[in-house]
Amino acid sequence: MSFYDTYLEYENFDTEGFLKEVKEPDVLGIIKKNKLNHHDFLALLSPAAANCLEEMAQRAQELSLQHFGKTVLLYTPLYLSNYCVNRCAYCSYNIDHDIKRKKLTYDEIEKEAQIIAETGLKHILLLTGESRIETPVSYLVEAVKIMKKYFDSIAIEIDPLEKEDYQRLIEAGVDGLTIYQEVYDEEVYKQVHLAGPKRNYHFRLDAPERACEANIHNVNIGALLGLNKWQHEAFMTGMHANYLQNKYNDVELSISLPRIRPHVGGFRDVYPVTDQDLVQVLLAFRIYLPYVAITMSTRERGSLRDHLIPLGVTKMSAGVTTEVGGHSDSDKGDSQFEISDTRSVEEMRKAILNKGYQPIFKNWMAI
Amino acid sequence: MEGFNIGGKSLKSRLLVGTGKFASYDLMKQAIEGCGTQVVTMALRRVNLDHKEDNILEYIPKDTILLPNTSGARNAEEAIRIARLSRAMGCGDWVKIEVISDQKYLLPDNEETVKATEVLAKEGFIVLPYMNPDLMIAKRLESVGAAAVMPLGSPIGTNKGLQTKEMIRILIEEIKVPIIVDAGIGKPSQAAEAMEMGAEAVLVNTAIATAQNPVKMAKAFELAVRAGRLAFNGVTAPQAKVARASSPLTGFLHEGEA
């Protein structure tokens, strides 16, 4: 039994037909419920729900205050390498792209860590392209050992691993895993992942579960919004989070809502996701899964991110560069995508305070 | 108001305050100072000694007793490690045991809580375990050295008040160490109710931190807790199911009387 069984239940479900049938009074009734079922959640992604955004926002804010209070956790990503063996249609790291490749040495990792640590951040997310040759688990274990000197919480966003490899990294000091399915629709998945190990839909889909079995502390999942109809992808993301939470009670779950951003390469077959759509997805997640953390990255512009804070965002990145070696300004490798919110950690801290929320630099420590 | 004792320490204020969820540490500080609490709990995992503005300890008045909690612990072993770390970091000997392996409802794991309490009490900690109200577990916590027992009124953050009232009432009757109602208290009137029942104290966080005006709300809780304790000491008048004057079953005996 894995989440794939749940996916199959809905594979041939007439999502669009269902969404068309939802009426505004249905949505307003669902908002008041204590516990939503799968169809309630799907209804919150309907066109009728788009007309009830203010009511949804009020409820989402109430639930966010109850579970998280007026706090936003800050973290930043550190790109270790942009070597990748996959051919993903939407990603600059695609092996076919002529970008400047780079992998940080251990000395460079330490230099980057020192510079980031000076900003006061205690939570770090280590990222790599997907290459077992350039960035094997042994390399990551060493990187984590360096990070432990500077940070209290270390998460990874890398290629999917076997349970034993997750265990090795957890023993080294990793407490969080971020892994996006990118697109839940299996057919679309095959269309945008043209070659490479990432083409293995199932191995990626079950990766969060393998990390849970390895006893990781927190897991962050998401779909790359824009690769398929957002209603379908948001629904499956929420269902996946719900599945993991019910099966692994002690794991803290987070959801991200990354929208596709400009990148190197020619992929233009994007399903549009407007700001309003993004807000609707965010609110639906919060109402369906009030206890999960919601992450909003610097893919989104600063003014939009600020407005999303009171709606249920609980984690935000700050002081971001997606270039390998981007913090220490040395010999950089090219970035994965263009970011939109370029504010420094200090600027983000002030922006969060201005919204009447408390920026949290440390919310976890390895015990 | 008469004080009460935890672990040999005499306390005047019966309101303990939690520090999560505030919009800023300045606001938290004002709320703490305004309500006169003497015990403040904070998650050790959030203590950030390296960053002055993010270091919660900078905002907790110096004469307050720190009650570090083990929030984030999923089993006894993790809770024990956090408590020891807390002591090593200079946060004192008091510890609130929170062992939560359910991230959805945040309900405590009573069994693991007993295990952690036993180990830490032996090591000289003043242990205040947060628990799901259950008499047998409360007795075990008491017997392994808990300095107080902290049953939940309703799940953390729900503000639903004393949903477990009857179980708490039994704990108050049967347990000798102080009963401090923790979690779920959403309004001052609910805190007063807990105190009227005979709880020694209450711990409040979300209801203060997420109120529109946390400073005023903290003060309101202080007054409610005092009122509730006074009412308990004054012994409330008994309730009657029917008005004393009416005698629906025997009234006929008096029919015809003037």
Curated annotation (Swiss-Prot), chain B:
The active site is at 96 (schiff-base intermediate with dxp). Its main location: cytoplasm. Homotetramer. Forms heterodimers with either ThiH or ThiS. Pfam families: ThiG. It catalyses: [ThiS sulfur-carrier protein]-C-terminal-Gly-aminoethanethioate + 2-iminoacetate + 1-deoxy-D-xylulose 5-phosphate = [ThiS sulfur-carrier protein]-C-terminal Gly-Gly + 2-[(2R,5Z)-2-carboxy-4-methylthiazol-5(2H)-ylidene]ethyl phosphate + 2 H2O + H(+). The keyword Transmembrane helix does not apply. Keywords: Cytoplasm, Schiff base, Thiamine biosynthesis, Transferase. This is Thiazole synthase. Its EC number is 2.8.1.10. GO terms for biological process: thiamine diphosphate biosynthetic process. 1-deoxy-D-xylulose 5-phosphate binds at residues 157, 183-184, 205-206. The gene is thiG. InterPro entries: Aldolase_TIM, Thiazole_synthase_ThiG, ThiG. HAMAP family: ThiG. Belongs to the ThiG family. It comes from the Bacteria. Pathway: Cofactor biosynthesis; thiamine diphosphate biosynthesis. One of its GO terms (molecular function) is thiazole synthase activity.
